[in-house]
């Protein structure tokens, strides 16, 4: 189970300085030690080149000390819980992260991914019908406006600004945009982004179904 304070889903997003909790059960009732590590990723979930000290404050590879034994159950187990940030580890920056768990022999067990966000700007999104007849029933168009100060400093060949669009928290269908179509001092504009989204609710048949019986 992996959840933030207000969200419980397979992919979790939290605001910076908020808490996230990972819990899991161990059916092996022997005394086993488990540890967790934190890794940072870029905008397409490739491991970043940052040092640990660049994105976390404290220690990595921490022992999980919060656990409880089952009581009055058919199968005995231990429940382990990790809440971060904590006294041993805090996040310095926002971005994409994973928390991985391994045993005391260094064997990898599993990992869960999550993102930490900072609301530094406002984004406006408008949805339209696809203008391409071939995609009319399967795609939607998006216009996105990013409001920012000194937007000109965010664009160019060396820019690290990336706009990533995902649907229903599924990164497999992501769209990554590196440059806006138009940029001004206070806004970046991305036009006519075509996205498979389904238009099944666009059409409404309001014809009368009343008929005269003969």
Show where each model-derived region lies.
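Low-complexity, Pro/Ser/Thr- and charge-rich linker/hinge segments at domain boundaries
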Residues: 116-139
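Contiguous beta-strand segments within globular domains
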Residues: 1-40, 135-148
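Extracellular Ig-like/FN3 beta-sandwich strand-entry sites
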Residues: 17, 31-33, 92-96, 197-206
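Edge beta-strands of extracellular beta-sandwich domains
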Residues: 110-114
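Ligand-binding face of N-terminal immunoglobulin V-set domains in extracellular IgSF glycoproteins
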Residues: 74-102
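Extended low-complexity, serine/threonine- and proline-enriched intrinsically disordered segments
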Residues: 30-58, 154-179
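Aromatic sugar-binding surface patches on proteins
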Residues: 63-66, 71-85, 184-213
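Short acidic/polar inter-strand loop motif in beta-rich domains
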Residues: 43-45, 89, 103-109, 170, ...
């Amino acid at each position: 189970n992996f959840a933030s304070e207000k969200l419980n889903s397979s992919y979790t997003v939290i605001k910076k300085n908020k808490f996230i909790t990972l819990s899991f059960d161990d059916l092996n009732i022997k005394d086993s030690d488990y540890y967790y590590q934190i890794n940072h990723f870029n905008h397409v979930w490739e491991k970043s080149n940052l040092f640990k000290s660049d994105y976390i404050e404290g220690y990595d590879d921490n022992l999980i000390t919060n656990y409880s034994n089952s009581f009055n159950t058919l199968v005995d187990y231990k429940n382990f819980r990790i809440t971060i940030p904590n006294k041993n580890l805090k996040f310095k920056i926002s971005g994409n992260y994973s928390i991985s768990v391994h045993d005391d022999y260094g064997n990898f067990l599993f990992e869960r991914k999550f993102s930490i966000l900072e609301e530094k700007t406002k984004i406006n999104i408008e949805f339209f019908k696809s203008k391409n007849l071939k995609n009319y029933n399967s795609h939607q168009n998006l216009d996105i406006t990013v409001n920012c100060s000194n937007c000109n400093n965010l664009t160019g060949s060396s820019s690290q600004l990336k706009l990533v669009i995902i649907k229903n928290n599924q990164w497999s269908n992501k769209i990554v945009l590196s440059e806006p179509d138009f940029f001004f001092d206070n806004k970046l504009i991305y036009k006519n982004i075509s996205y498979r989204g389904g238009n099944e609710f666009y059409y409404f048949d309001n014809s009368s179904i009343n008929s005269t019986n003969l």
